[in-house]
């Protein structure tokens, strides 16, 4: 998987699981359970997810403080637009 495929998969799975608003997850949980990425991709996936949090054009934001590194989608619309703009697959019912 290339980097953009990993980013798209993370956003798609977070959207499908509706991790938005008050619903948040830890970075480790998103990578290992929500996105269900292969173990050999987990390290790079965590790096990409962390980069996306600090990138204003990405639909993912950090939430809360402390050591837990919680993330959530900025909005459903932002996630759908991101996937469309980056040749990602939008989950059924969100398009």
Predicted regions mapped to residue ranges:
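Short alpha-helical segments that sit at the start of domains
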Residues: 1-22
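Short, hydrophobic-biased segments on the C-terminal half of alpha helices
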Residues: 11, 45-53
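Short helix-coil junctions and helix-kink-helix linkers
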Residues: 28-43
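Long, compositionally biased intrinsically disordered regions
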Residues: 34, 66, 94-95
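A short, conserved structural fragment
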Residues: 53-65
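Minor-groove-contacting beta-hairpin "wing" of winged helix-turn-helix DNA-binding domains
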Residues: 65-74
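Short, amphipathic alpha-helical interaction segments positioned at domain boundaries
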Residues: 75-95
């Amino acid at each position: 998987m290339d980097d953009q495929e990993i980013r798209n998969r993370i956003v798609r799975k977070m959207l499908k699981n509706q991790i938005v608003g008050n619903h948040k997850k830890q970075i480790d949980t998103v990578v290992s359970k929500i996105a269900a990425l292969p173990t050999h991709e987990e390290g790079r996936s965590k790096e990409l997810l962390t980069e996306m949090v600090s990138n204003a054009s990405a639909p993912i934001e950090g939430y809360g403080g402390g050591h837990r590194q919680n993330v959530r989608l900025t909005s459903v619309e932002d996630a759908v637009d991101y996937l469309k703009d980056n040749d990602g697959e939008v989950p059924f019912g969100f398009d």
